[in-house]
Amino acid sequence: MARGLRTAGHDVTIVSRHPGYVPSKAIAWDGVRAAMPETDAIVNLAGEPLADGRWTAARKAEIVASRVDATRVVVDAIAASPGRARVLVNASAVGFYGASGDAPLDETAPAGHDFLASACARWEAAAWPAKDHDVRVVVLRIGVVLGPDGGALGKMVIPFRAGVGGRLGSGKQWMSWIHRDDVVGLVLAALGNTAYAGAVNATAPSPVRNRDFTQA
C-alpha cells in the first residue's frame, strides 16, 4: 500500500507499533496527534490478522480492540486538528454482512449477527465520527485480499502444497475476493475522488464459491 501511494506521488508516513523496524518514514501510534497538522489524508488499515491463531475469547477481544482502538486514535487526532485532514479512508470487511446465503449484497444491506459482523460494525462506528469534523469518510468493506506473494493466498496455498488442501465443508460458501493491486487502486481513487463517501464494497465484481476457488 505504501509503495503504491508513493508511486502515485503521495508523501507517506507509516504508523507502526515498531517504527524503528520500518524501512521508511514512520511514527509510533502515540505520535499520530502531533503529526496531524501536516496530514492531508489518512488511510487506516490497522488490525490484528484474523488468521493468526485460534479464535479464543481473548483472541476475539484482541481482533476487535486492535481495530476499534486504532480508529479512535485517528479520529481523536482529527478532532484535535480541525480543518487539516480532508479524507479518512478506513478499512472494514465484507464480514460486516455476516452469512447471507445466495442473497446479493450492496452497501445498504444491514450488518449481520455473527462475531465478524459485530467486529466490523464496531470498527466502522469508530470511524464515522470523523464526519463531524468536515472530513470525508470512506469505509472500504474489503473482501479476501489475494496476491501472488502474500495476502490471504499466501496462507491458503500452504495446505495445498502439502497435499492436504481442499474445499471447506460443502464448498458452496461464496467468497468475495479482491486482488491486492485493486485494493491499492481503490484507496487511491477514494483519496482523490470526492464522489467516494460512506461505505464501499471493495471486491471483484464476481464472487466465487469455495469449491471453485480451491479447484483453481
What are these regions (language model features)?
Residues 1-10:
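N-terminal Rossmann NAD(P)H-binding glycine-rich loop of SDR-like oxidoreductase domains
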Residues 20-73:
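NAD(P)H-binding glycine-rich loop region in Rossmannoid oxidoreductase-like domains
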Residues 65, 69, 101-139:
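Catalytic helix-loop patch of NAD(P)-dependent Rossmann-fold dehydrogenases
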Residues 72-114:
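Conserved Rossmann-fold NAD(P)-dependent oxidoreductase catalytic core, especially the SDR/UDP-sugar
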Residues 121, 130-139, 143-175, 180:
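NAD(P)-dependent short-chain dehydrogenase/reductase
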Residues 193-216:
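Mid/C-terminal beta-alpha module of Rossmann-like enzyme folds, strongest
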